[in-house]
Amino acid sequence: MEEELKSFVKVWGSAIISVSYCYYIPSKIKSGVHRLLSVLPVCVLFLVLPLFFVFTIFSSTTAFCLSILANFKLILFAFDKGPLLPLPANLFRFICFTCLPIKIQKNPNSQNHLPKWVFFCKAAIFGVLLNVHNYKSSLPPILLICLYPLHLYLVLDVLLTIVNALLTIILGCDLEPHFNEPYLATSLQDFWGRRWNLMVPAIFRPGVYHPMRSVCQPQMRSDWARFMGCWTTFFVSGLIHELVYFYINRETPTWEVTWFFVLQGVCTAMEKAVKRKTRWSLSPMLSRLITVGFLVVTGYFLFFRQIERSNMLERRATEASLIIDFVKHKLSNFLL
């Protein structure tokens, strides 16, 4: 455990030093290829850092924050785009907005904040799910299909909401929420674009969708250019998730996750095309059932099977227990 914490300090210390370099040096270079070349060594380093961990909690968190989000932010920053512009007022803010999955909320008064009791209900359900996983072997398959996506959503929503609340106090500014009640999505476009893990579409739109659409626009009809932009965005997302799975399991990719996102990209693009050409629509309740049902079923067979085979959730629970016991032991020694 101590070795893992030493690795944590070294990895994130290296990340802070690297981002500090980006704040003082590349930010002074003219945007474009030259600035991109100046940040590329940092991007390569961020791809390597998750490999220093054994615990999946640390490797997956570092991969998400540094290898994916921070790298995309820095590449967009090289071309004067993305969430790092305008340049934060000081180094501390630049480090936070680069290394952490946060973004300043542009219109804080326009957001419909849910009552606090909703968050506490989610936290309570998450606590129940942790105990339910102990009896996973005796649960019927139909229940497992719903259990995995619910667990993923709640663990991300609860933890990221807590992180957002703390950083809002520390930074003194309102931050964008990560989720917008995805279980209320009435379409795939609504789910992926406006409700699920909102930091990712905020980066993928300027980083993947718009460039791909611009490249395709002169070569094909606008409908097909939009389709290629949408499909490419989901394809890149699939490759990124395969990379995260590699950091966690250190195994050859199965490409199941990539196929999941390819399927989502094709279906989302087709859904958008149908909406533009017809006025046919379903009731909101039926739309929600179809959308969430499609995501849950396809997610179980293409996204969560790899998690199930690798016992990822059980490993993370064991690691969390080890970390808590280690902290308790150190605190008791310190106090005594």
Swiss-Prot record:
Catalytic activity: a long chain fatty alcohol + a fatty acyl-CoA = a wax ester + CoA
Membrane topology of this protein: Multi-pass membrane protein
Pfam families for this protein: MBOAT_2 (PF13813)
GO terms of molecular function: long-chain-alcohol O-fatty-acyltransferase activity
Entry EC number(s): 2.3.1.75
Top-level taxon: Eukaryota
Transmembrane feature ranges: 7-27, 38-58, 59-79, 82-102, 117-135, 152-172, 228-248, 284-304
Any GO BP: lipid metabolic process
Keywords for the protein's UniProt record, in alphabetical order: Acyltransferase, Lipid biosynthesis, Lipid metabolism, Membrane, Transferase, Transmembrane, Transmembrane helix
Name of the top EC class for this enzyme: transferase
Recorded GO CC terms: membrane
Compartment list: Membrane
InterPro entries documented for this protein: Wax_synthase (IPR044851), Wax_synthase_dom (IPR032805), Wax_synthase_Magnoliopsida (IPR017088)
Similarity field: Belongs to the wax synthase family.
Purpose: Catalyzes the final step in the synthesis of long-chain linear esters (waxes).
Name this polypeptide is given: Probable long-chain-alcohol O-fatty-acyltransferase 8
